[in-house]
Amino acid sequence: YSFRAGQFARLGMELEPGAAPVIRGYSIASAPEAPTLEFFITAVKDGQLSPKITALEPGQSVLLDGPAEGSLTPDRIPGGSTLWLLATGSGLSPFASMLRSEAFWAAWKDVVLVLSVRQIEEAVLARELVAALPLERRPKLIVTTTRETDPARFGDLTGRIPTLIASGALEAAAERQITPEESRVLLCGN
């Protein structure tokens, strides 16, 4: 399956025998050169498809519909010295694909990955992702929590990304400035 880092694929399942499959777009989390496709999918409580996909067992099938789509790809970003990847929740997926990609690291050396989650447990995938990367390819990871009330469970920061940018707290935590001349910023999530 051919795709560029940052793109999404349309996955589907036939939920009732003989019915048309229900299809949704999910960002690909694996690198383009990986032998398998990986997705970070959050089961939406009353969702039509995501609970079914996340309940699949090994060996069960899912429909992969059509070619990969999407324009949140690093080849569309003009050069700069620092790339900021700002994600909320499963918006981490396209950035995981980029960070795992050989071609991505040929273009970017200084990367800041910011993940905003409700509770700190939701940051496990990001921490595992960064830890699995070679040392020379690890972005600066900043986790911010929005619904933790116990200070012992806060992330690196607490609050929503726009508020942290406006206050200067995000730049302080990253030890870098966001400037139009040198920074490029990608956003993904809700």
Segments (PLM) and residue ranges:
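Ser/Thr-glycine-rich phosphate-binding loops at phosphate-binding pockets of nucleotides
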Residues: 88-93
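Histidine-anchored nucleotide/phosphate-binding helix
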Residues: 94-104
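Reductase modules of NAD(P)H-dependent flavoproteins
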Residues: 114, 119-189
